[in-house]
Amino acid sequence: MNASCTLQLFANGAWCDVGSVSLLGPEAQGWRSKTYTGYSVEWAIEHGGARDAHAFACRFPVGLQAFEHPHWPVFLIDMLPQGFGREELLRRLGLSVTAGESVDWRLLLAGAGNSVGNLRVKEAASWLAANAGPLRGFTDDEVAERGDDFAEYLASHGLFVAGSSGVQGEWPKILLTRAEDGLLYLDHTLEDARAREHYIVKFGRGSNEALASILRHEAAYMALARMLGLRV
């Protein structure tokens, strides 16, 4: 397996190859493996010194100097699939859902292609595109009611993407995007030019009333965050 991955940033309306991360330690060590991170020469010359959205992170200023760490860079760890999405992606890859850190690199190369934000792993984006399935839109009611067509489509083409979206954790959740036709699509299947609104959709877990209550109250906290000036 490739011991390096290409990092892409979304800038000026397009995904740009801006640098890479290479393993210097054993892949089996997972995120604890030593790494070498650097920007491409072209990107470093064009955006030298930047710590804004043109950088991997604010503590990784753009430049020609490389970064060596005793583990993965933190921004890369943040893109590693976790929780429910990790389990679904492991199944998709034919691996045990209890697999530990030794499969972290394989998960990254398949599961960091549709992260929230402007940073992604190019190899993971390519893997996701090859496994995306047919483009299909759904009405709000079909999503809310979890109709048969939506549930079947999601099981075949969507749940494993939860691990690559950055909306991770133990709750089943996915990213949906509304297109110009008013329908909702799995975010990774819709081209950027058609996107109008973006949503995080979280599903309930079984018939546990306590968990259902937690889910219902999240809307109130979102409204409170909006009142406080947060963009939610």
Label each PLM-derived region with a short phrase.
Residues 1-232:
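Phosphate/dinucleotide-binding and metal-coordinating scaffold of catalytic cores
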